[in-house]
A protein has these predicted regions:
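Compositionally biased terminal segments of proteins
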Residues: 1-154
Length: 154
């Protein structure tokens, strides 16, 4: 069951709409919002949608701009970032093998928790400047040992 109180109703509805789009069928929700919906440990305001498949950046950008009024802030090399109705949206190709099959819960496609842990640890290792990544890992440490989380990452 999703912890829907962790995101605004409009954000959840936008997520459902985006995941119904044919051009976004390979994209899954990742990051803090995916964890918040699963675990209920914090509020989250953005939508990170990742795919492992190459996508037509121009076609996806055009669809999001025309159908949703996306204000694009960055579009290059399999990465699209912007805002729809003030909600930050990232559509990114993240090419690494799945640890587990993505889940679909209440119409939402989410990466598995082990996959998200690997992404969070990668973000900390490469940047380490976002407090929310540490909050997420701290919460996850109540469910997974640190060694287990490191195994997901390596």
């Amino acid at each position: 069951m999703l912890q829907k109180e962790t995101i605004e109703p409009g954000t959840l509805e936008l997520l459902k709409q985006l995941q119904r789009e044919p051009l976004l069928q390979s994209f899954n929700l990742v990051g803090g919002t995916a964890l918040a919906l699963r675990m209920g440990h914090r509020k989250s305001i953005d939508l990170d949608l990742f795919t492992r498949e190459a996508f037509d950046l121009e076609e996806v950008t055009e669809m999001l701009v025309h159908h949703y009024g996306m204000k694009v802030t960055y579009a290059r090399k399999q990465t699209l970032k912007g805002f729809i109705n003030g909600i930050k949206i990232d559509c990114i190709r993240y090419d690494y093998p799945h640890l587990n099959t993505p889940d679909t819960i209440e119409e939402i496609r989410l990466e598995s928790v082990p996959d998200i842990i690997a992404m969070k640890l990668s973000a900390i290792a490469h940047n380490g400047s976002r407090i929310k990544d540490y909050i997420d890992i701290a919460n996850l440490s109540t469910h997974y040992s640190f060694n287990t989380m490191l195994e997901f990452y390596t």
